[in-house]
Amino acid sequence: MFVNNSVDRRRTLRLAVLLALGLGWTATAQAATDLFLTWPGIVGTSQVKGHQGDIELVSYTQSASNIPVSPGTGKGAGPPTQSTPICGQITIMKRVDQTSPVFLGMVLSGNTTPGPVIFTFAKAGSSTPNTTYYTVSLRKVIPASITQSDSLGDDTITETIVVMASQFVFTYTPQLPTGGPGTPVSFGWDCVTNRAL
């Protein structure tokens, strides 16, 4: 996927701003990463080998946090004994394409997708091109909002889509010195029951 230097600088700046805001957890697509979205029933424009028909993304941001809850107030109140995990949401940016009217329709109709909806992070330009090292799989997914703009400053219109889901599964696959995949590390969370999967 071709990305010019001006886009690289904007991505770096965007990441710095997000970190400054102190989000609980964030992940943003970098210049050395190709980022793809696989959404059941939606055909994207990607022609990248292994990701034909996927949706190519410009950036991805995820937040999660855990808010401590104090048992009481006043002089005798002890330290927080409970907490409230918040799954947060996923915000993606993509170029306007044939999938744009579909996402707009899903936002306005409030349609929920059972899933799985999968975000794939793949290393680009390495000795093993497009090697997947991180995936985020969602179930019971709904696009909550969509905003279109020319924020990249060129002739391309982009759109920012906020996605919410009931279940998240995060999987990181390390790369061995030989270039092959290592043992995947996964964590899943159910946002409805607030329990690990």
Regions found by a protein language model. Give the residues of each.
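N-terminal secretory signal peptides that target proteins for export/translocation
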Residues: 1-10
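Glycine-rich, low-complexity segments
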Residues: 11, 27-28
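Bacterial N-terminal signal peptides
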Residues: 16-25
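Glycine-rich, low-complexity intrinsically disordered segments
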Residues: 30-197
